């Protein structure tokens, strides 16, 4: 699936992406892991961003987690075809929606319980949060450093970047930022389109079938393109 066009369509159509371009079968998109902050300070953004995660999760290899004071895997909840039903399931299962924020604790739980399974094959991790955090900033820095070592690319999406006066000076954001490959906004269609372009431009993984074909060519004295 052509990721950038899928993401743009999802953003513009409120989560539905029906018109898709197909990418080459010889390469595969990197898996995406979404860690979405659903704490009280993110109330005005959470639904919009979960709609977006729902849309790309139906078309791409995506694992999605929600966090506030605890981490909850919601991948299976977002697979429901109807977005309103999917979000109702999320609201019923994620018991700390609208609560405080413990980003470091959420990352620790993710890396202890889920990272080995979902960070293979050069995954790209998207953390969606405003960076307001009640935890220990030093712990957050350590967890971010560990996460960065485990993934292909670590991207932080902060909806507050849509404001021209915003500065990432909270303790949590300041601790996390040095470990991010990219620091982007997530407040508008245009911001999500920029994210789609970034992800679409990342080097793809060569599929197993393509590697097998390349090996066959090499065995017969041919040359395969990388």
What is each residue range found by the language model?
Residues 1-30:
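Negatively charged sequence features
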Residues 44-47, 51-102:
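Metal-dependent catalytic core segments for phosphate chemistry
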Residues 144-226:
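Von Willebrand factor type A / integrin I
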């Amino acid at each position: 699936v052509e990721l950038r066009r899928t993401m743009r369509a999802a953003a513009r159509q409120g989560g539905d992406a029906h018109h898709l371009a197909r990418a080459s079968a010889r390469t595969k998109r990197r898996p995406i892991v979404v860690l979405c902050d659903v704490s009280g300070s993110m109330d005005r953004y959470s639904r919009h961003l979960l709609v977006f995660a729902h849309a790309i999760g139906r078309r791409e290899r995506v694992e999605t987690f929600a966090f506030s004071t605890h981490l909850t895997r919601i991948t299976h909840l977002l697979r429901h075809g109807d977005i309103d039903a999917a979000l109702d399931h999320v609201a019923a299962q994620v018991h700390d929606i609208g609560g405080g924020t413990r980003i470091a604790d959420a990352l620790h739980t993710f890396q202890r319980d889920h990272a080995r399974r979902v960070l293979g094959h050069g995954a790209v991790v998207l953390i969606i949060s405003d960076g307001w955090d009640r935890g220990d900033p030093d712990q957050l820095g350590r967890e971010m450093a560990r996460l960065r070592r485990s993934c292909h690319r670590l991207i932080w999406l902060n909806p507050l970047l849509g404001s021209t006066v915003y500065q990432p000076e909270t303790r949590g954001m300041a601790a996390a930022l040095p470990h991010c490959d990219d620091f982007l906004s997530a407040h508008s269609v245009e911001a999500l389109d920029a994210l789609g372009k970034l992800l679409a431009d990342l080097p793809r993984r060569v599929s197993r079938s393509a590697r097998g074909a390349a090996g066959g060519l090499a065995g017969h004295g041919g040359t395969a393109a990388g």
